[in-house]
A protein has these predicted regions:
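Catalytic Walker B motif of ABC-type/P-loop ATPase nucleotide-binding domains
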Residues: 133-136
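Conserved ABC transporter NBD signature motif
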Residues: 33-41, 50
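Conserved ABC ATPase "signature" region
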Residues: 86-104
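Conserved ABC ATPase signature
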Residues: 108-112
Length: 246
């Protein structure tokens, strides 16, 4: 994965997606091979040190949140660091502004919606200024409006220089938001291609138990070739219309 990329990791349940994330974050130790960040082997880094560079956001925000108040939750990762309390306050406030949570900084977390709690967990990771964020099913349990809000928020973070990796079963998310897709099956990486190329490959779809996009079906039935180009153009135009209204 390269800096400033936005990448999806897809595959059937048990394919190894979450295991890969745990290996990268240091929750599990690889039996062979290396985990490199900027060319440096992370084998000697403990979880806390890795968290300064790599953030992990779980699918259910309630499994990550441990404090009552928003400010306290986001500040938690910085406690015990070399930063002064004033530096921590400033870092937390800056992060809350980026995440659209600053107006709620003194609110109890219990007053937030599921989507807002999701942002709190992202803020608690971002406050450490990681180079890479890994998210497990970032839009799970959200309606379309909140789905769009969280994905546009993540796209904005990516445009600011944060590398974003998403573990997902949502093929539309993969297709619309991530130019690159990594496909896993039985613990092996079986494809590293564009999202459109993945979803226009029937054999790969079957092998990885992915869901064929209706756009690929439409392209085939209408005799449009190459289908990959049609899918990419359609997604681009659809995003432009929803974003700009024309």
């Amino acid at each position: 994965v390269y800096k400033r990329q936005m990448v999806s990791i897809v595959g059937r349940n048990g394919a190894g997606k979450s295991t890969l994330a745990k290996l990268i974050c240091g929750f599990e130790t690889p039996e062979q091979g290396q985990v490199l960040l900027n060319g440096r082997d992370l084998a000697q880094d403990n979880i806390r040190r890795r968290a300064q560079h790599i953030g992990y956001v779980m699918q259910n925000p309630n499994q990550m949140i441990s404090k009552t108040m928003i400010f306290e939750e986001v500040a938690l990762a910085l406690q015990g660091s070399d930063m002064t309390q004033e530096q921590i306050r400033q870092r937390v406030e800056d992060t809350l502004k980026v995440c659209g949570l600053y107006p709620f900084r003194n609110w109890p977390i219990s007053a937030l919606s599921f989507g807002q709690k999701k942002r709190v967990t992202i803020a608690s990771v971002l406050v450490q200024q990681p180079e890479l964020i890994i998210l497990d099913e970032p839009t799970a349990g959200q309606d379309f409006r909140h789905y769009t809000d969280i994905m546009e928020f993540l796209r904005g973070l990516n445009e600011q220089g944060v590398t974003v990796v998403m573990i997902t079963h949502d093929m539309h998310l993969m297709l619309e938001y991530t130019p690159r897709a990594l496909v896993f099956c039985d613990g092996q990486l079986i494809a590293d291609r564009s999202a459109a190329a993945v979803l226009c490959d029937p054999e790969l779809i079957e092998q990885a138990a992915l869901k064929e996009t209706s756009l690929f079906t439409l392209a085939n039935r209408c005799g449009i070739a190459p289908a990959e180009d049609f899918v990419e153009r359609f997604i681009h135009e659809d995003r432009e219309v929803r974003t700009h209204g024309c």
